[in-house]
Amino acid sequence: MGLQSKLTVYAAIVGCLALMGGIVYYASLDNVSLEQVEVELANVALREAGEDEAKFVVTFLVKNPSEKTYVVPVIAYQLYANDVLLGSGKYSTEDVALPGRAQIFGGGEVPLKNTFILNKSEVGSEIYQLMINNEITNFVAEGMIITQSTWSVAETEFRSEK
């Protein structure tokens, strides 16, 4: 192979690497916008209660103060009532394709609902009865939210009280 051919191959490899570096750099420009997400625990409401298990609807109000449009594939959280850990929950749309998820436009906010299952055996009868009788009004959710745009993904920790 002649010198001219080797230079052409090397130039093509360098060009491909430069193109890949440019794509990675362009994708990282969204990270700052994605990390500006705000999560507010909007509501915890009883949906149904049984003898040993109760289901609650946990509503998060997700706000987008940036100009970028993004989606939320995951909110993983721990729910506390009166400083007692009730358990962990997870809102997830990971199995839904990106275009099918709820889009949060720049400056917008979207309520996202999740079913939280409370087991009597994990929290004790006293807390369980207070929860199903709607006698607890102080809730705290803390965890991690994942935001995603076409080019980028960001994980942000949050804590919210209601």
Feature locations, PLM:
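Membrane engagement elements in two modes
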Residues: 1-55, 150-162
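Beta-strand signatures of extracellular beta-sandwich domains
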Residues: 76-80, 142
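Intrinsically disordered, low-complexity Pro/Gly/Ser/Thr-rich segments with frequent PxxP/GP/PP motifs
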Residues: 83-123
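Hydrophobic core residues within well-ordered beta-strands of beta-rich domains
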Residues: 54-56, 75, 110, 139
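Short, hydrophobic/aromatic beta-strand segments
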Residues: 68-76, 87-90
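Short, solvent-exposed loop/turn segments enriched in Ser/Thr/Gly
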Residues: 52-59, 131-133
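Asparagine-centered strand-capping/turn motif at beta-strand->loop junctions
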Residues: 48, 60-66
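Terminal connector regions
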Residues: 117-162
